[in-house]
From Swiss-Prot:
UniProt entry tagged with the keyword Signal: yes
Pfam families attached to this UniProt entry: Glyco_hydro_32C, Glyco_hydro_32N
Organism of origin: Aspergillus rugulosus
GO molecular function: sucrose alpha-glucosidase activity
UniProt name for this protein: Putative glycosyl hydrolase ecdF
The enzyme's E.C. designation: 3.2.1.-
Length: 508
């Protein structure tokens, strides 16, 4: 019965223009990267780049949605609007707990949001401020905008202020100052600015590709910075993390999201040498412009991250909406004998809307056997743990019917995890919409490989191991492609555990 209800819900979502069941999408029209992610009280706030009047990029405002669990979302009115010929580009939010900005009171400190003001008439970009004194429900633009003008940017920007955007702002307690990180796109650099009141800013330093030891030369076009301090699990230390989205050089081609670690003294970020094997936060094509939620307790020991799942502009075959939020994931940093590495997992709130559907333990699967062929579903959470003989390929096909399928595969011979979209459904909308995306994934110390696949109406997000690697891809299969098949090639595998959960209920 649960599966039947799920298939009906997922079918309704697909019939409604590929709308997902448990991922956020706008009610209508265009969405790109998330903005200003912040938790206020028990409410998660999602702001995002949004064109409310058309299904293409342009006329960008801050869309707004709220949630109590990061699974179910409520659409809210626009937060920061495009007006007077100035669009509201990407930015971030932060709680001004001490009211250093003077935009609230000591009894009711404000929430602040910095964003890039974009002038379509001439391409100018400057930095602007808005504030909220009603817990993020409504936002007022600062009357002294811009807080950093294009003229002020010009000495630090090769284009004279035409390519300075995406402010990431946080309060740095050790220096007692606000820090702003700005991206400079094709110049492959970030600039760092400081302020004592969140309104008046001074340039402090630049970070360029030549200052990042070991950064591959193919990584170009730096966009959408995020920066924060996290504990290093396995030690008693903390470190700083700088995330950004390069336009080129990612494992799957096109935009990708990488993370640098290092130290920060309030003025200069000093990056550690890059370990290419742990550089990328996603090996798929569709994880772009990632940001993390602010105002979480330090005791959590992790950040919660989300990105836009779309690297094809207006090309995907959705007619009433464009752009989907990746499912929120935790991000934590760990220390091993060989170095530091990140782990990512879907937020645990997903478990609260799931009911176990299939459970298998300690079963050997040999070539010729096909498991799960009688199971149907288009919105699923599949978790597999297995050990494989030499030369074994374990293959999990999802959204399968006839010749159509998306194949998640693990190859023992070269220890790789992959997602194959070659026959996943509609791919003609963009030259990059098909193909195979691969990530390195070694078994754990006991020889067990773990795979977790989140499957929704038009996406797969595959987490390998404890979350050492992730592959996120959009897919557009037929509505009737709802089958699964689990099999092995070239050897046997022992399924230590297999669990399959349906997603119960739509997101919105």
């Amino acid at each position: 019965m649960f599966l039947h209800i799920l298939c009906l819900l997922a079918g309704q979502a697909l019939a409604d223009d590929y709308r997902p069941v448990f991922h956020f999408v706008p009610e209508k029209n265009w969405m790109n990267e998330p903005n200003g992610l912040i938790k206020i009280g028990s409410t998660w706030h999602l702001f995002y780049q949004h064109n409310p009047t058309a299904n293409v990029w342009g006329n960008l405002n801050w869309g707004h949605a709220t949630s109590s669990d990061l699974v179910h979302w409520t659409h809210e009115p626009l937060a920061i609007t495009s007006e007077n010929g100035i669009e509201a580009f990407t930015g971030t939010s932060y709680y001004d707990a001490e009211n250093t900005s003077g935009l609230g009171t000591s009894d009711n400190p404000p929430y602040l949001a910095w964003y890039t003001g974009y002038f379509p008439s001439n391409g100018t970009q400057d930095q602007r401020l808005a504030f909220s004194i009603d817990a993020g429900e409504t936002w007022t633009k600062f009357e002294g905008n811009p807080v950093i003008s294009a003229a002020q940017e010009a000495p630090h920007d090769a284009t004279g202020g035409l390519e300075t955007r995406d402010p990431k702002v946080f309060f740095h307690a050790d220096s007692g100052k606000w820090i702003m990180v700005l991206a400079h796109g094709g110049q492959n650099k970030m600039s760092f600015w400081t302020s004592v009141d969140a309104k008046r800013w001074s340039w402090a330093s630049d970070l360029t590709s030549t200052q990042v030891p070991g950064l591959p030369s193919a990584v170009k076009g730096w966009e959408v910075p995020d920066m924060f301090e996290v504990p290093v699990h396995g030690t008693d230390k903390t470190t700083w993390v700088l995330i950004f989205t390069p336009a080129e050089g990612s494992p799957a081609g096109g935009n990708g999201v990488l993370a640098l670690t290092g130290s920060f003294d309030g003025t200069v970020f000093h990056p550690n040498p890059v370990n290419v094997s742990t550089l990328w936060l996603d090996y798929g094509r569709d994880f772009d412009g990632a940001l993390s939620w602010e105002n979480l307790p330090d005791s959590d020991g992790h950040r919660i991250l989300a990105a836009i799942s779309n690297s094809y502009g207006a090309n995907p075959p959705t007619n009433t909406w464009k752009g989907m939020l990746s499912f929120p994931r935790t991000l934590s940093l760990h220390q091993s004998q060989t170095g530091q590495y990140f782990l990512q997992q879907p937020v645990s709130n997903l478990d609260t809307v799931s009911t176990p559907l299939v459970s298998v333990k300690n079963q050997t699967i040999a070539p010729g056997q096909v498991l799960l062929s009688s199971v149907r579903g288009t919105a699923l959470d599949i978790r597999i743990a297995f050990s494989a003989n030499a030369g074994t390929v374990l293959s999990l096909a999802v959204r399968k019917a006839g010749s159509q399928e998306t194949v998640i595969q693990y190859r023992q011979s070269d220890a790789t995890l992959s997602v194959d979209r070659t026959t996943s459904g509609l791919t003609s909308y963009d030259p990059a919409a098909g193909g195979v995306h691969t990530a390195p994934l070694r078994p754990d110390a006991s020889g067990v490989v773990q795979i977790r696949a989140l499957v929704d109406t038009c996406s797969v997000e595959v987490f390998g191991g404890q979350g050492e690697v992730v592959i996120s891809d959009l897919i557009f299969p037929d509505e009737t492609s709802d089958g699964l098949a689990l099999q092995v090639i070239g050897g046997t595998a022992v399924l230590r555990s297999l669990e399959k959960f349906p997603r119960l209920g739509a997101v919105l």
